[in-house]
From Swiss-Prot:
Its EC number is 3.1.26.4. This is Ribonuclease HII. The gene is rnhB. It comes from Chlorobium phaeovibrioides (strain DSM 265 / 1930). It comes from the Bacteria. One of its GO terms (cellular component) is ribonuclease H2 complex.
Length: 205
């Protein structure tokens, strides 16, 4: 993956920010968003950053190796976490928008353009943006944000695994796998579960 999309924008602006989230679909844990701004005319080269892809297509070990390289290469980056209790209170869409806006706010600079993975965004500041469905598969800065968000969330879920080992959070990261559903049947929900998320397999309305 190259920075072709960003290069078109760099002709007329400087600070292009990629934004993505991890954790909209799980039954437990936070939603995490990341924002990444690379220097103007950045090129990934042939090293670890030359292997960039949608984080879902990268192995966990490669994501962990890539994340610090992204942070070192970026002009600015930020990660924001919105917990399960907030998700239950304001709903997952609003929580995702909150996480994304907090990530942008944590950059320490004002981007000229936001490139947001997906089809919806509600900016809290007056900045130009584009929503791009599947953007993490072809836009470098969005893919980089997806790696930072996914890596951060995986680390959080691994820490929760130590607190609640009976659920296996390190293995499924809170997603509704058969293992996770079975654990909820046996143990009920724990404090990091999203109580507003209902599961048909648990006969919840």
């Amino acid at each position: 993956m190259l920075t072709d999309y960003e290069e078109q924008l760099w002709n007329s602006m400087e600070r292009i920010c990629g934004i993505d989230e991890a954790g909209r679909g799980p039954l437990a844990g936070p939603v995490v968003a990341a924002a990444v701004v690379f220097p103007r005319w950045f090129r990934p080269g042939k090293g670890i950053l030359g292997r960039m892809n949608d984080s879902k297509k990268l192995s966990p070990s490669l994501r962990r190796e890539m994340a610090p390289a992204i942070q070192d290469a970026a002009l600015a980056w930020s990660v924001s976490v919105v917990d399960a209790q907030t998700i239950d209170r304001i709903n997952i869409l609003s929580a995702t928008m909150l996480a994304m806006n907090r990530a942008v706010g944590g950059l320490g600079l004002t981007p000229d353009m936001l490139l947001v993975d997906g089809n919806r965004f509600s900016p809290e500041t007056p900045v130009a943006y584009r929503t791009l469905v599947g953007g993490d598969a072809y836009i470098y800065s969005i893919a980089a944000a997806s790696v930072l968000a996914k890596t951060a969330r995986d680390a959080i879920m691994s820490s929760y695994d130590r607190d609640y080992p009976e659920y296996g959070f390190a293995r499924h990261a809170g997603y509704p796998t058969a293992m996770h559903i079975s654990a909820i049947r046996q143990h009920g929900r724990c404090p990091i579960h999203r109580f507003s998320f209902k599961v048909r397999r648990l006969n919840e309305a």
